[in-house]
Amino acid sequence: MRNVQETLLYKWFDKVWNKDDENAIDELMTDDAGAKGILADDQPKGASGFKIFFNDFRNQFHDIKIDVEEVISEDDFESARTTVSAIHTESGKQVSFAGMCMVRIVNGKIGEAWNNYDFLGLYQQLGQKLSPVE
């Protein structure tokens, strides 16, 4: 089993999120990468599209920390189980939620990503409730 700190996903979460390095997005993601579960189908792909999400999230939260609990790596795929913690800027509430990310690696960069994060749990921690559609 690979050392977690040697994996691309660990580097991604550490550089991009924990060290708040927007330039690392260009370094670690291809120009045409998709990011399911994060980017809408009509948003730009790749680093430029991800930067939209990155900056929107950073505008709403600060002191963002992503702990990489485990990484499984096989061939050109990596999958990570993570815990995100942050402070909601508007309310000052501390939040924490779990998530998983799987990526396909192309030439040493993220070429495609599938994300599954507990955004419902995040919204509940902020006091938001889902209402039925009428």
Give residue spans per PLM region:
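A short hydrophobic beta-strand element
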Residues: 75-84
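Short, surface-exposed coil-to-beta transition loops
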Residues: 65-66, 81, 95-101
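Hydrophobic pocket/interface hotspot
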Residues: 9, 24-26, 33, 50, ...
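A solvent-exposed, acidic/Ser-Thr-rich amphipathic alpha-helical stretch
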Residues: 2-4, 22-76
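Short, low-complexity N-terminal intrinsically disordered segments enriched in polar/charged residues
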Residues: 1-31, 130-134
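Short, cysteine-centered beta-strand-loop-beta hairpins and adjacent loop/turn segments enriched
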Residues: 59, 63, 86-96
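Residue-level structural signal for beta-strand termini and adjacent loop
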Residues: 100, 115-116
